[in-house]
A protein has these predicted regions:
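Extended, structured, electrostatic nucleic-acid-contact surfaces
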Residues: 1-3, 195-220, 228-234
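Gly/Thr-rich phosphate-binding beta-strand-loop-beta motif of the actin/hexokinase/Hsp70
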Residues: 2-20, 96
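Nucleic-acid-processing active sites and adjacent nucleic-acid-binding tracks
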Residues: 23-47
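Conserved DEDDh/DEDDy metal-dependent 3′-5′ exonuclease domain
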Residues: 43-81
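Short alpha-helix plus adjacent loop in nuclease-associated cores
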Residues: 72-120, 161-166, 258-273
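Glycine-rich, often acidic, oxyanion-interacting loops/wings at catalytic, nucleic-acid
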Residues: 123-213
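Phosphate-backbone recognition surface of nucleic-acid-processing proteins
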Residues: 213-216, 222, 226-306, 310
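Low-complexity, acidic/Ser/Thr- and charged residue-rich accessory regions of DNA metabolism proteins
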Residues: 259, 298-338
Length: 338
């Protein structure tokens, strides 16, 4: 039994294994429970293991590596084309192993427990932000149904709702006022929770030398800096900065054939939250550069905006920032202003 590539279909209790040799032929299949999994892998000579990016993938990656194996995490969308036959654990494990063999396969960057801790902060914060947005939208809709409009911004809602509740002449019933008051209390509570996560992210930022280095890039703040470090670490999974920018989805979608090259909108692949942070920061850079033409960066931004418009310039700045940050993390260097 000469296993070089081992695909493992992860689950809660039952795991399916499929081993391939150098020629890609299946030479090993096994179905094992959670308690027996580690002993099973300990009896297999060191090989390259592939697992899908799912819940617990990074935990198992660290555990398998302690047994002497090399482990790669693959996005499910890259595994699906290699599935043959019906949907079952055996075919899924074999598809993972076949995908693992591909020389051009893109793998998910590994994450340490510390990186996962930081990512958890961002995920939890974003969930609460979405909940607060939904709460404000509900309050706005309920009031508009009674002929009382309020602005769309969160800050406007925070100022307007107390005044509406105190206005005895706006026609709201007592029951409606109590309902809006409860929703407004929920809105304020969510705001306090968001503030808690903001402070936690600031603490992580102050304690991380890498985060502080990349935050010197224009358009990069504590949230983006910590999110980048949590997502890619030192960026060793990427060949270059262009590869990282493409992984983020900050490159044009291509639809070309022969000599006809067609570039479309962004591919919007990869981490949506991280890409959003890059776009927000780049948008601020473009706005500031409008009133300040000093420096090479501002001149480039303004010239590009005249030719391509605000939105395309924003994406171009985000792409440039991503490539700069990858270089800084990969080579452990500081930001050099041109």
């Amino acid at each position: 039994m000469n296993i070089l590539f081992l695909g493992i279909d992860l689950a809660k209790n039952v795991f399916q294994l499929c081993g391939l040799n150098q020629a890609g032929k299946s030479v090993y299949t096994k179905r094992t429970g959670r308690k027996e999994l580690l002993q099973t892998l300990a009896n297999i000579p060191a090989c390259l293991i592939g697992i899908e990016a799912s819940t617990g993938a990074f935990y198992w990656q660290r555990v398998f590596e302690k047994l002497g194996h090399k482990v790669k995490v693959i996005s499910p969308q890259y595994v699906k084309p290699f599935v043959r036959g019906q949907k079952n654990d055996g075919n899924d494990a074999q598809a993972i192993a076949v995908a693992l063999m591909q020389p051009t396969m893109q793998f998910v960057p590994p994450k340490s427990p510390e990186q996962q801790d930081i990512q958890t902060l961002h995920r939890a914060r974003q969930r609460i932000v979405n909940h607060r947005t939904a709460t404000v939208c509900q309050i706005r809709g309920l009031l508009l149904d009674r002929g009382i409009p309020i602005g769309s911004a969160v800050s406007r809602a925070r100022r307007a709702i107390p005044l509406i509740l105190e206005d005895a002449e706006n026609g709201l019933s007592s029951r409606m006022r109590r309902t809006i008051a409860e929703l407004y209390d929920l809105f304020n509570d969510l705001g306090r929770r968001i503030h808690f996560f903001d402070k936690e992210i600031e603490t992580v930022f102050r304690q991380s030398e890498a985060c502080q280095r990349i935050a010197k890039v224009k358009g990069i703040g504590p949230k983006t800096a910590t999110a980048v470090v949590a997502a890619i670490g030192k960026g060793t999974e990427f060949k270059n900065g262009r590869h990282f920018a493409a992984w983020l989805g900050l490159v044009p979608r291509q639809h070309s054939s022969g000599d006809r090259q067609v570039l479309m909108n962004m591919t919007i692949k990869g981490d949506k939250h991280l890409r959003t942070l890059f776009i927000y920061g780049a948008r601020a850079v473009v706005r500031v550069a409008t009133n300040n033409n000093d420096g090479h960066m501002n001149q480039w931004v303004n010239q590009l905006k005249e030719r391509r418009g605000f939105n395309k310039t924003t994406v171009a700045v985000a792409n440039k920032n991503a490539r700069i940050i990858w270089s800084m993390l990969r080579n452990d260097t500081g930001y050099q202003v041109v």
